[in-house]
A protein has these predicted regions:
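Solvent-exposed loop/turn segments at secondary-structure junctions
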Residues: 1-3, 24-29, 49-55, 75-80, ...
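Extracellular/periplasmic Venus flytrap/periplasmic-binding protein
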Residues: 1-38
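Stable alpha-helical elements in mature extracytoplasmic
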Residues: 4-7, 24-31, 84-94, 121, ...
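Extracellular/periplasmic catalytic domains that process cell-envelope and extracellular macromolecules
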Residues: 12-14, 37-39, 62-66, 139, ...
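Glycine-rich, aromatic-lined ligand/substrate-binding cores of catalytic
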Residues: 23, 42, 150
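Extracellular/periplasmic periplasmic-binding protein-like sensory domains
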Residues: 35-119
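Segments of small-molecule ligand-sensing domains
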Residues: 102-115, 122, 126-189
């Protein structure tokens, strides 16, 4: 949509105290600018797809995000805990080392959410292989599947997944992140 004024006014006039925005960056920009223009000051919850400090920082610059109109992005990773930060540091260190060894900057992939997802998938796979080894059984499809069904796997940087007892529990807890309203000492929003 290119115009959210009617929808925003309906929400504002109904007294809604939070907006859940199921959209990507471009429609979110339109929504946030419309909320700014009609002085609708409630918090917005959206998907991790919008969790870019660059994107959200631009909203701060235009006054679309303010202390009275924050945007909270869901995140299935949480680096605010001691364990989450330790896991992120391990990921960042591994990615930076790989990049530097391959002529890259050392921070390109270490800050990339797709690289994080791949790292986590690989980590879960390695945890499963280690669980097969610990069980002392031959590595084959049947034993791998059996171990996957019996083991709770820790997700680096947050939560766990379990396939035990027929469950298909992926991430069962989410974090909410928001952008700071001021640039840091490097001149960027975080």
């Amino acid at each position: 949509a290119t115009d959210f004024s009617a929808a925003v006014n309906v929400l504002k006039n109904a007294g809604c105290d939070v907006v859940i925005a199921c959209m990507n960056q471009n429609p979110l920009a339109t929504l946030m600018n419309t909320m700014r223009d009609v002085n609708y000051n409630v918090n917005v919850v959206t998907s991790y797809v919008n969790a870019s400090a660059t994107t959200l920082g631009a909203f701060v610059d235009t006054g679309a995000i303010t202390a009275n109109r924050m945007v909270y992005c869901t995140a299935w990773l949480d680096v605010t805990t001691e364990q989450g930060l330790a896991d992120y540091t391990a990921f960042y260190t591994a990615m930076s080392a790989w990049e530097l060894a391959n002529g890259e900057s050392g921070s390109t992939y270490a800050l990339n959410s797709y690289a994080m997802a791949g790292y986590i998938a690989g980590n879960i796979f390695v945890q499963a292989l280690q669980a097969v080894d610990k069980a002392g059984v031959e590595l084959n499809y049947a034993n791998f599947a059996k171990v996957m069904e019996e083991t709770n796997f820790a997700i680096p940087m947050g939560g766990s997944i379990s396939y035990a007892n027929g469950d298909r529990l992926g991430v069962t807890a989410l974090a909410l992140n928001c952008v700071s309203l001021e640039k840091n000492e490097a001149g960027v929003y975080a």
